[in-house]
Curated annotation (Swiss-Prot):
Organism, as annotated: Mus musculus (Mouse)
One GO MF term: hydrolase activity, acting on carbon-nitrogen (but not peptide) bonds
InterPro entries, sorted: Amidohydro-rel (IPR006680), Hydantoinase/dihydroPyrase (IPR011778), Metal-dep_hydrolase_composite (IPR011059), Metal_Hydrolase (IPR032466), Metallo-dep_Hydrolases_sf (IPR050378)
Name of this protein: Dihydropyrimidinase-related protein 4
Signal peptide bounds: none
Amino acid sequence: MSFQGKKSIPRITSDRLLIKGGKIVNDDQSFHADLYVEDGLIKQIGENLIVPGGIKTIDAHGLMVLPGGVDVHTRLQMPVMGMTPADDFCQGTKAALAGGTTMILDHVFPDAGVSLLAAYEQWRERADSAACCDYSLHVDIPRWHESTKEELEALVRDKGVNSFLVFMAYKDRCQCTDGQIYEIFSLIRDLGAVAQVHAENGDIVEEEQKRLLEQGITGPEGHVLSHPEEVEAEAVYRAVTIAKQANCPLYVTKVMSKGAADMVAQAKRRGVVVFGEPITASLGTDGSHYWSKNWAKAAAFVTSPPINPDPTTADHLTSLLSSGDLQVTGSAHCTFTTAQKAVGKDNFTLIPEGVNGIEERMSVVWEKCVASGKMDENEFVAVTSTNAAKIFNFYPRKGRVAVGSDADLVIWNPRATKVFSAKSHNLNVEYNIFEGVECRGVPTVVISQGRVVLEDGNLLVTPGAGRFIPRKTFPDFVYKRIKARNRLAEIHGVPRGLYDGPVHEVMLPAKPGSGTQARASCSGKISVPPVRNLHQSGFSLSGSQADDHIARRTAQKIMAPPGGRSNITSLS
């Protein structure tokens, strides 16, 4: 079955390329070899390759040849109060390619009154006509009702979607109850998809927002103050608990704090199938900027969960990422102009949430993890590309440099440096949250679908060239353990005889509107309390009695010790 759908954009002819002298880096090995690309695929890898004449040759001596980056979390079309992000599918994917990312996974978020299927079609239509690189889609579940089950089944069966996100925050808008989350996770497990969660305690966040506004705190600092680290960590723990009970794989998006990251790491060490996604912002900057005197700058950092103000957070997250306790990196790229952010100038709860990071992600991870000595080049490939491809089931088409894989490649210079700035970034916003940050490790050539799209600092992109990448269910990387546990977790009752002894009667609470209580035994059966019928009773106040035929003793002798005793305890 084809998931491609309608696509009116003509296919762009790929280049025939020979990449010579580079060091090919995958998640599990590195080696020097030449590489030949044709028809958008990697055709040959080795030495002394026999290739056609007249092809373009790229000299990669002293450089690395990596699989193109995969950004697992973008929101390039997220609707907020009637506004859409400044960086749409065209601008956002252009920035992605500039940073070495050749595929994104964007989140579909339905507007009120729009079904999941209709929202999916809206996203496909927008992305197909604008995306400059390949893309796929997660689908968010902002509301849960009976028809949602059929929609999820259709998205999995017919639309190539295998991941769905639920919210534990945004009360009265899209926050799910624990019971709903358990039901959704159970369904997702049966469908063979990946359950994602935005983890924050929405009830506490709402109360904190009210309290701060009552105290007159209206600026961006109120955002981070109303989202303390503990509400993220608590929600992660709760999500892990629910997922474990449902035996459903869990993917925690936007891991922003030490507490949340530790919860993911501890659960993983206990054997829970859970994945954690720190983003560019949580790895590359901190939340001290919420207190900037410049309101517009402070507002540019507003996202949920917030960037943690603790300056040691990034170091902690990169350590867990390097050790494998966290497995993937996204950007959660969702940018708004200063004018759009200013909708919340008098109330921080109205500031549109979202930060940049799609262009900076690869270099930030290299600087913070590889250049610092925390991880090697292979682990870098794993957390920026391969693990995402495995989790969401498009590996080895993406995420690997191998014969037959898509020719999405990055020629990486580990020694080159780049300073990020709003003056030079490929975004449509006035602020860059990584302003002035210098990173080692930059892409010098980027190849998408076998075409050179970045070379010598020049971007050569084509809007609409990006393809939708469908994904099948039950990815082995995720579900092998889940399937084994399903087989082992069959529950059988204890064989025993029926209990036929007495059952105590209890009062059941009255049903609303009934005004009466019912009496029930512990077995759950409702019984009417016995009432003596005095008209049929043998009791009489005078005359003969019904039990006159029973012999009675005329007297009872009380036995007591000499001198008597204060308490009579026995009669005979």
